[in-house]
Structures are given as C-alpha cells and as structure tokens.
C-alpha cells in the first residue's frame, strides 16, 4: 500500500512523493546563508597582524599567515578577529590571497589604516562558523540527525578542531594536525523528547566520541559548527556542510 507525502518548496509550490505505508523519508537541511559555491575559512593569523580598509576592501597584513595562496579560497566567507574600527565576525567574502603575508576581503565602511588585529595576538579562540535552528517538534522519538562536513586545513603542527553542538552542548569533535583533510559525520538519535545519544566519526571509520544530551526537542534548539586552531600561522576551512534528518 502506498501513501503521498506533500512538501512545500521555498517558492510556495506543492510537491508530492509516493512512499510505502509506514516508510520513513529522510530529508536534508542546508545551513542558512551558506556562501554560494564556496565555504567558510578560519585563520589564526599571527601576532602583530594589522588591517586597513580602502573603498570597502580590507587588507590584512600577517607575515606567514599560513593560508593557501592563490584562488583556492577566493569567495569564501572569512572570519575576521576584529580591530578598533572593524568588529570581529564573518565577512563575505575573500577577494584575494596574493602571497604568504596578505589577505583581502570585502567589508563596507569608512576607510582606516594600520589597525592592530585582535590586540596584536593570534586568533586561537573557539569560533562559531555556522548555525541553524531545529524547530521544536520537528524531531520525534527515535529520530536521527546526521551533520555531514567536508573540511581541510593547514599541515602545520597546530591542532585544528571542529566541534558540533546541539542546544549549546557538544555533540562531537574532530581534531587533526598535519592531516586535516576529511569528511566527517556527527549526529544523534533521539530517545523520547528529552534524551539524545550522540556519535562522531571521520571518513567512514569507527565512532570517536559518544555523548548523552538531555535537550527538549519540543522547543527550538540550535545546531552549530565551531572551529578552533591552537597556534598562529594556520587555518581551517569548511568546504561543505549539510544536515540529514531521518524523522
């Protein structure tokens, strides 16, 4: 026996899908505002990094910043650690990385010159890179959520960490130093409406972490991807992220 499941697309149009009675149909959510045809770049920069802005173009001067030069990350969203005139935050987007000491990106505002970035220190603080809201009652007993992430980073000795959180609590964590390129999956299964069992693994390998959370899935909860780099002159990039939900 078959049933019809009706969906509404972003333009308000109706769609129907035929499924067997009792079937569970997974669906996928994109992180809102994810940059088109690009990803998100976090760089630790270096001590004594400076920035200036001319006609909406910010030039970061950071000697041996460690980020791949050329066009690889042009168009990526960039986390800027902040300076007196320009607030810390994510900016769209990188315009150029012409050499090992320079990064340019777009940010509207008044011109300024030679401002110290992050009070003259490298950026090694855990940083939220993207987030979405899982609406209350979207998940049910035995629902499963999987966050699939593609990431890459510099090959120096600093630890590059990606952490996923649900409702502000850690779900999974993936760390790498010299081999920081991987596809990772982190997720959880719901038990009732107030318990989640979380798991995490990389490149199809076995689970690397397991957590028990007690979030109320009848109310809205945040789902966030966070990055951390432990030393100067390195970077971490999210090249893609999507959330699979099996209701």
Give, region by region, the residue ranges found by the protein language model.
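Surface-exposed molecular-recognition determinants
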Residues: 2-43, 123-247
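Small/polar beta-strand repeat architecture
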Residues: 43-125
């Amino acid at each position: 026996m078959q049933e019809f499941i009706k969906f509404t697309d972003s333009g308000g149009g109706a769609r129907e899908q035929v499924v067997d009675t009792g079937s569970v149909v997974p669906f996928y959510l994109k992180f809102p505002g994810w940059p088109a045809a690009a990803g998100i770049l976090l760089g630790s920069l270096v001590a004594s990094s400076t920035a200036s802005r001319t006609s909406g173009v910010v030039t970061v001067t950071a000697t041996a910043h460690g980020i791949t030069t050329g066009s690889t990350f042009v168009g990526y969203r960039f986390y800027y650690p902040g300076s007196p005139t320009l607030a810390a935050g994510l900016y769209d987007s990188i315009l150029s990385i012409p050499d090992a000491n320079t990064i340019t990106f777009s940010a509207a505002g008044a011109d300024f010159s030679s401002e110290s970035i992050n009070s003259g220190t490298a950026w090694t603080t855990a940083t939220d890179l993207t987030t979405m809201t899982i609406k209350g009652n979207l998940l049910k007993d035995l629902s499963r959520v999987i966050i699939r992430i593609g990431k890459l980073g510099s090959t120096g000795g600093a630890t590059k960490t990606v952490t996923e959180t649900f409702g502000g609590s850690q779900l999974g964590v993936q760390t790498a130093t010299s081999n920081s390129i991987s596809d990772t999956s982190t997720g959880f299964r719901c038990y009732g409406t107030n318990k989640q069992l979380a798991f995490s693994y990389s490149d199809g390998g076995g689970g690397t972490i397991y957590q028990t959370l007690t979030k109320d899935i009848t109310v809205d909860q945040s789902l966030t991807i966070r990055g951390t780099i432990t030393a100067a002159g390195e970077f971490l990039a999210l090249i893609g992220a999507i959330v699979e939900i099996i209701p």
